[in-house]
């Protein structure tokens, strides 16, 4: 395996120099203050720009003078975020990075991620909060039953995977004509309007609709959560 083009075993020391990590279940030295802990970690990593550490603490509204054992879950998470960002590593690996953060601090985290991306650095995030992933990530991997089901740019996966379609016909149509088409699901007919979800290409659905008088057609962009659920429902949204 390689990380940043380096062999994960032969180049382990160099990888550690260029990578930082935030675990999902963060464990800190409770007897230390936030400042003491960050200085300790900074020394282990060969020193950091302490002015940048102070800027991060200000952004996350983190009191570095309090003992860690007295901090709430969210405030401990802030310390974890600061230690992950403070070295300005090329790659940051994070597991559930916004756990325990209030909405304002989540937005601050998203802004910081945007700045890191703009600098050409990489953040690898594991998260169950699908809207968060959609908001901040360029590429996404979906794991299903312990295996990597797909890796795609977010916009490509959304465009290719799911289509939310609404057809308006001149008269009511039989839903069973459409419900059995490949990739078509959740067919609902109300009056002369038909709504459905299409996994993969909508070609079969469009051709079937052409057998009736269509007076209107609209589509809604699928969310990443829609795509995620499609994988776990057993569909195969990778079909082009």
Residue ranges and their predicted role:
Residues 163-240:
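Short, charged/small-residue-rich alpha-helical element at the C-terminal edge
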Residues 11, 153, 204:
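Short acidic active-site motifs
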Residues 109-197:
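ABC transporter nucleotide-binding domain
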Residues 1-144, 148-150:
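ABC transporter nucleotide-binding domains
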Residues 5-7, 26, 66-68, 154, ...:
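Short, well-ordered turn and helix-capping elements at secondary-structure junctions
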């Amino acid at each position: 395996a390689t990380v940043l083009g380096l062999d994960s075993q032969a180049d382990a020391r160099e990888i550690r120099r260029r990578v930082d990590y935030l675990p999902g279940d963060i464990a800190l030295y409770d007897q230390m203050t936030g400042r003491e802990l960050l200085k300790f970690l900074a020394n282990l990593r060969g020193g950091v720009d302490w002015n940048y550490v102070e800027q991060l603490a200000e952004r996350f509204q983190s009191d570095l003078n309090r003992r860690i054992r007295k901090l709430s879950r969210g405030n401990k998470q802030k310390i974890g975020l600061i230690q992950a960002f403070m070295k300005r590593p090329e790659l940051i690996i994070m597991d559930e990075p916004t756990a325990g953060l209030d909405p304002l601090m989540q937005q601050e985290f998203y802004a910081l991620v945007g700045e890191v991306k703009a600098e050409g650095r990489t953040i690898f995030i594991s998260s169950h909060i699908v809207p968060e992933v959609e908001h901040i990530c360029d590429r996404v991997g979906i794991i299903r039953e312990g295996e990597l089901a797909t890796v795609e740019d977010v916009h490509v996966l959304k465009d290719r995977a799911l289509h939310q379609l609404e057809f308006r016909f001149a008269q009511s149509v039989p839903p069973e004509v459409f419900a059995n088409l490949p990739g078509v699901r959740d067919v609902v007919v109300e009056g002369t309007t038909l709504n459905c979800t299409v996994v993969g290409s909508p070609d079969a659905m469009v051709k079937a609709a052409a057998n009736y008088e269509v007076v209107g057609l609209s589509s809604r962009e699928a969310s990443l959560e829609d795509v995620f659920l499609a994988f776990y429902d057993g569909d195969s949204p990778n079909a082009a």
